[in-house]
Amino acid sequence: MYIICTYADITTIRRFNTMKQFMDKDFLLSTDTAKALFHDYAENMPILDYHCHINPKEIAEDRKFENITQVWLGGDHYKWRQMRSNGVDEYYITGGASDREKFQKWAETLTKAIGNPLYHWSHLELQRYFDYHGVLNGDTAEEVWNICNAKLADDSMTVRNIIKKSGVTLICTTDDPVDSLEYHKQIAEDPTFDVQVLPAWRPDKAMNIEKPDYTDYHAKLSEVSGVEVKSFEGLKEALVKRMAFFDSMGCRASDHALEYVMYKPATAEEIEAIFAKRLGGAALTKEEELKFKTAFMTFVGKEYNKLGWAMQLHYGAKRDNNVFRYNQLGPDTGYDCINTYSSSAEMADFLNSMNATDELPKTIIYSLNPIDNAAIGTVLGCFQDSTAVGKIQQGSAWWFNDHKVGMTDQMTSLANLGLLGNFIGMLTDSRSFLSYTRHEYFRRIMCELLGKWVENGEYPADMKTLGGMVRDISYNNAVRYFGFKLDTVEK
């Protein structure tokens, strides 16, 4: 008997003999060194999520989700953007469509997301939390919907159990100075839940003097602090009191969302005059706004140094560009983009102003523009000292950059210009409790990068040293850097 094979048949046979399985155990790992580093060192490390946007109330109340749409699409503007790009009507995104209809539209959109991290994240979450190893698309949406919802109905999939299942030891939420932190307190006092949930200080509303509701915010700050905010000195006093409260609740980090890092110094008298002008209802010039924000950031930075907090600077986003949709849906709904203005010179001046008086805190710098990687890498080296290992850090690839290429580029640039071994690693920056797989995604990409360097002869195949480095970047460095009350994992 003769079997006649066409060229296409032979090509297909060869391809299936060599092609990797879809997102198998060695997903993103192409070398033996990368596989060993991930499976032997990175894979089972705990997770320390030092920056995210999850709601502590949902942890305190141990929320149980009714369906996968609530988990995936309730507030995920990453997914919303792609659904809009696929021509999906807003009714099925943030509108009144049923959860099942919204999930269907997302499944149909996901098919086209080849090369997008959402494709990988979604399938990692399906594998790790729902034991589904198939492919989500429009045709399989009903099957996946039923599988996920059946799992979510089980008590093992409450918010707290998801966190424990993920291997999380500590979470830092994002909190305003006026927040009561009542849910953090409730969690901390619950002996049945041993994951630390700590606040992180986010004082953007106290700084953004140009916003129309700025004076209204000061009324809230005055109430919770017991300090009447009628001057910049009063504002500083109120903030110091709230910082002390946050510190007592375990806070070890601040976070700032900046359009860019500014540095426009002014005298104390000028700042008081600018503050009084704004409280009087007058509009400020751009120069006055920048002077005030410079004074604000310099003040809080020095206070962070006293407290031993780390200062996180997230900059480079131009937000709320679609005014029509902003008026309908509000902020954080998927209408932001990268701001191409480079502020590395001002950033260096800003850091130098605190360093000159020995008051520069530990600082983590994130730019949304990947072009800034090298500039940040060189700024880091200007302000390192012996007070902390890797005192000034470049943050992990952020938002529009937390994909395979973005993470690889960020770590490569950091390695080229600094010490990758001191990097504090990944964070979710997410509003979803299923996003902890992003730590796995990052670790796979990191191990692939290190593995290629080793197998190319660029670094010794010393698995003890490499394994320690992988563990450190995955978890230990962040424990040490922030000073959290956690044990490191050395073996």
Predicted regions and their residues:
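Short, Lys/Arg-enriched N-terminal segments with co-localized hydrophobic residues
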Residues: M1-T18
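Metal-cofactor-binding active-site regions of metalloenzymes
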Residues: K20-L307, E359-P361, I365-G377, G381-K491
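C-terminal amphipathic alpha-helical interaction region
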Residues: M311-L313
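Metal/cofactor-centered catalytic core regions of large enzymes
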Residues: E288, T333-C337
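Hard-cation-handling environments
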Residues: N322
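Divalent-cation-assisted or electrostatically stabilized phosphate/pyrophosphate-binding catalytic cores
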Residues: Y341-M347
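Short glycine/proline- and charge-enriched loop/turn segments
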Residues: Y326-G334
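Short, basic/hydrophobic alpha-helical segments
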Residues: F350-A356
